[in-house]
């Protein structure tokens, strides 16, 4: 049976059609609806996803199963979406609404869980029995995979590492709290820290690292804060879960600094006499999420 994976992102919605042996036979990307009110955005997202599924199914000569990766998660109490930074989804019955539109059951999981699943299944973490997948991009998230199965937890929030508090009086987070990990080591969080220190507004993380390498004092200090926050945040995961490996994804996973200076920033906070956990870059790139969504049926 062929499978369809859908990845609902902040800027794009991607769909793939997979064969039984996990070969991608078609891929479609469309922009995520923007600049409209929440109700209109939600309806537009439903339409976009349904249209993608219809197009992918047209090229499948057998029955398909559909998996969807999305920011946030489904409440086990209400069946409604919660904790999504695509805020138009919160409080909506996404699964039921999609199933009604396309006339079949769908499986939905948090996008970070889908990322982690794909990397554990046949990506950077395939040789390890337990994987913690970290997404560091526009936001920060995580997913726990044990023996190629998502560990979602009793409330469906396992791995929501980005909303652990790191600084009691840190920057405001969209979730209503302050000093969440996401506000400090996401791309926007890194850039905002540099700007608050007097740096050039609108600088990307790669820009800031380049400025630091060229002697910009504000950038040097901002990079040091970023790495300190990264080290403390990742160490908290290792001390609790002790995964066999950690795989980094999202735009910031392309920063080489994370794999040497970032690793060294973790070590002082590990409650052990040695730090052997591999910190790996993802193998599937920005396709990790959409592949993981398709693997929800495995």
Regions found by a protein language model. Give the residues of each.
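ATP-binding/phosphotransfer module of carbohydrate and carboxylate kinases, centering on a glycine-rich
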Residues: 1-65, 75-78, 96-106, 121-128, ...
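Short beta-strand segments
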Residues: 7, 67-71, 109, 133-139, ...
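A short acidic/small-residue loop/turn micro-motif
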Residues: 31-34, 89, 158-160
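Gly/Ser/Thr-rich active-site cleft segment
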Residues: 65-85, 89-93
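Active-site nucleophile and cofactor-binding loops and adjacent substrate-binding regions
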Residues: 86-91, 107-113, 133-136, 280-287
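Conserved PLP phosphate-binding loop immediately N-terminal to the Schiff-base lysine helix
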Residues: 109-123
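Glycine-rich phosphate-binding loop of actin/hexokinase-like ATP-binding domains
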Residues: 126-184
